[in-house]
A protein has these predicted regions:
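Periplasmic-binding protein-like
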Residues: 116-119, 317-320
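Short coil/turn segments at secondary-structure boundaries
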Residues: 17-24, 122-123, 194-197, 215-221, ...
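Contiguous mid-protein beta-loop-alpha structural module that forms a pocket-lining wall or clamp
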Residues: 163-168
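A short glycine-rich beta-alpha junction/loop motif
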Residues: 85-92, 102-105, 125-148, 287-295, ...
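Sequence-specific dsDNA recognition surfaces
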Residues: 5-18, 32-64, 202-218, 232-264
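A generic structural signal for short beta-strands and their flanking turns/coil linkers
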Residues: 25, 43, 88-90, 225, ...
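Non-catalytic DNA-recognition/assembly elements of restriction-modification systems
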Residues: 1-13, 139-155, 169-212, 342, ...
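A short beta-sheet element
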Residues: 30-31, 54-112, 230, 254-313, ...
Length: 390
């Protein structure tokens, strides 16, 4: 065992002023850029190259960056593509002193482990916002194996990481296949490029059902006890039954609000970007209820639920959904039942909708196989990380 500060230099960042950001120069790596395992920088900010603090807080390729505020303990490896770069405040840079004694890949896997992140959370101070001390990082003890053992550990975890990436890419490609097939069969739904008839959504529905409001625990339910779905069970367009909260009094269970296989659930309230997302329930455990932030869309014989699900969530149609929402750009947006019923949608022949739904079902079966493989890999990685690092 060795202290992290004995094998690494631990450097703090600088409070670069946002009013001096430029559109080019040296990239400033902020705490928001440091995600678990990677750097996220879709909206980069820069500082003038000749600024003295830029030179003082300059980062190097393969530096390990650790978040010190909020979600503390997230660790990312700085790749060459992000250089030149400088370190902002509340991010620590961990830089190996002797790379021939500790491998950067080994140290990255160690610091990117769930165990290390949990230890950071425990050590962090603050109520409203957690803060981690660089001094604690210096004192944190890490296992140091022989170089041969470090290589073995790194190679094993690298191989699993690669397989995990490949499985995620497979899932993304299957999703893209469905989106592409939708456009091929039905055109661009935002401008009805294939000229299908329009109908108000109300003409395709038997009813829109509301969920219920309950006093809940913050914890997920145990076994199959009654629970209410969280908004996140539907938010991203795929039904997630584990996103639920136990209700405090099981006698308050409302049968009419229970979710069933074949339901089409719609988020009536969310952020402006995510409001109006839809999820089809391929299967579900019993005793899960809809919250009052979710509608259930009960369709009639004019429309296939799976077609409607993919239409509502399609990137080319999202603008129309967001246009019927009310609320300011900075607040939660809301879609009323009345506005939803008036939404104009394309209505292709039912046989085309059914053909498309059959494709979606086949693709979902393939996704399920890939997802199961992904989950096994993630469990394997978690077990190995526990074995190697605690």
């Amino acid at each position: 065992m060795a202290k992290l500060g004995e094998v690494c230099d631990i450097l703090n960042g600088y409070a670069f002023k946002s009013n001096q950001y430029t559109t080019s120069g040296v990239r400033i790596i902020r705490i928001s850029n440091v995600q678990k395992g990677y750097i996220e920088d879709k909206s980069p900010v820069y500082y003038p190259c000749d600024d003295e603090n830029v030179k003082k807080y300059e980062l190097k390729q393969n530096d390990l960056l650790i978040s010190l505020t909020g979600n503390v303990g997230r660790t990312a490896l700085l790749e060459e593509k992000f250089l030149p770069a400088a370190l902002n405040q509340r991010v620590s840079c961990v830089r190996l002193k002797e790379p021939d004694k500790v491998l950067k890949t080994y140290l990255f896997h160690l610091l990117n482990s769930d165990y290390f992140e949990q230890q950071c959370m425990k050590a962090a101070e603050g109520v409203a916002q957690k803060n981690l001390s660089p001094k604690w990082l210096f004192e944190y003890k890490i296992p140091i194996y022989s170089i041969e053992r470090q290589k073995e550990i790194s190679n094993t975890l690298d191989k699993i990481d690669l397989l995990i990436i490949l499985r995620k890419q497979q899932l993304a490609k299957l999703d893209e296949l469905v989106k592409a097939r939708f456009v091929e069969m039905f055109g661009n739904p935002s401008n009805n490029s294939l000229g299908f008839p329009y109908e108000p959504l109300s003409n395709c529905l038997l009813s829109i059902e509301n969920g219920k409001s309950f006093v809940c625990s913050n914890d997920m339910r145990q076994e199959e006890n009654p629970a209410i779905l969280k908004l996140s069970a539907v938010t991203y367009g795929v039904y997630q039954q584990d996103e639920n909260k136990a209700i405090l009094d099981s006698s308050m269970f409302v049968k009419s609000a229970e979710v069933h296989k074949g339901d089409l659930l719609f988020t009536r309230k969310n952020t402006p970007e995510l409001v109006g997302m839809c999820a089809y329930v391929n299967d579900t455990a019993p005793n899960l209820m809809m919250p009052d932030l979710i509608f259930r869309l009960n369709t009639n014989e004019k429309i296939n639920k799976i077609f409607l699900w993919k239409l509502i969530n399609h990137e080319f149609f999202r603008g129309k959904i967001q246009n019927i929402a009310t609320g300011s750009a900075k607040s939660m947006s809301n879609i009323s039942k009345e506005r939803l019923e008036k939404l104009a949608i394309i209505l292709p022949p039912l046989h085309l909708q059914n053909d498309f739904a059959t494709l979606v079902e086949r693709v979902d079966q393939q996704k399920q196989t890939v997802q199961q493989s992904l989950e096994k890999l993630e469990l394997m990685k978690k077990a190995l990380m526990q074995e190697y690092f605690g």
